[in-house]
């Protein structure tokens, strides 16, 4: 049997081409992992959808349509998914991790940009991009427990130091736009004390933070 070798670059082109065929209905925007990396989710921004992909990434297995485009997703220890959606009246959804059925829907500020479940505080943390705040939310009641003032336009966060701290990327510094000596700043939030304990200023030119 004669072997046919296909360069990796061609495979990549074929994959992109197959995805492009669905571009009329799917606008892939963000990727999320759940179930310890065993489940892959992709957002369809144009359709306000969260889609669970097959293990090979070739087809959609399940999907749910939400109020507006999905900005971020996290998973709690029980397996439920928590999703925040874009918009001035942003929404936070609680989804069944297996069926993707909506368990709850809660208004969540002005453009919630990221969400994270903390095993330290056993609560949800949500960055509010146009409120310039970090909210702590009780997942049982879905009520805001704490509001922390942070930098302008927080867009993303990540845990570190054994989940005891959050590193938050802010799109703009805390000063008028006419006086920017720097561009992006990072805030360090201590989860147990619920306080901003540090700030890292990035040099001018480090603009438009998207992720951390």
How should each PLM-predicted stretch be described?
Residues 13-212:
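Predominantly soluble domains enriched in secretory-pathway, periplasmic, or organellar proteins
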